[in-house]
Amino acid sequence: EAEPYIIGLTIDDGTRFEREIEAAAPALKPDLEFAGFFAIIGTYVGIIPVMIGLLWLPFIKKISKSKYHFFLALTIGLLLFLGIDSIEEAIDVVDENLSGSFNGNLLIATTVILSFLGLYYTSEKLTSRVDSIRISKPAAIALMISIGIGLHNFGEGLAIGAAVGLGSIAFSTFLIVGFALHNTTEGLAIAAPLSRGKPTIGKLLGLGLIAGAPAIFGAWVGGFAFSPFSSVIFLSIGAGAIFQVIVIILKWIREEGDSNLSSAAAASGIATGLLIMYLTSIII
């Protein structure tokens, strides 16, 4: 079992630096058994909930334009909460595990901004070439949403893998159940823009895997080679990606006719999305 330790370092002038390790335990050795175990966890936390959320698609296809704007705005609310949640998790990692020499808060801000700018440039190129690359604009937006959610789920996988690796069974179980319930809303975020296109089953499965499968890779990295620095980087990249997707959806709503984003559907949709995510976060 994991045991607490205090690790100290004394330098030439007698100054001593100490750090308490709450639960020191041998690192997991990568093997097929543990790899399969983490893959099952990642599937349960990432892929299955996203696929369940995609079941909203037939319903959204039948609704009116104003209700469609509501669901697009709902997507913004869901994603905004995820982006803020990613930054909060990154700050927690900085406070608990990262040396002050990394200047963690500035690292988070810089990574979020660079991620936002890089992915925004990529998405603009993608949406501007929708005709030449034979992909519809709704599908392009859904793809960017899937990528943003996938980066966020990678960070969730890191947290779960690290908890399992430390032997924190109760905490890791809480994370698995909590993230699984929380992530069922993510499929809805992907389904909303797709409802105005003609997605095939293959495309839906592909987008679901892009959004959910990174949880598996995150669990592998977190369980076998957890690094606080890399965790902060990936969580921050995920936040930047999510904020970039929010901007894309806002532009999409404006192009759909709500130029000032001031309609009741848009305002209530964003508020409802935030409320849904908040309630699921405190219930679990």
Question: Predicted segment positions?
Answer:
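Intrinsically disordered, metal-sensing/regulatory segments
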Residues: P4-I284
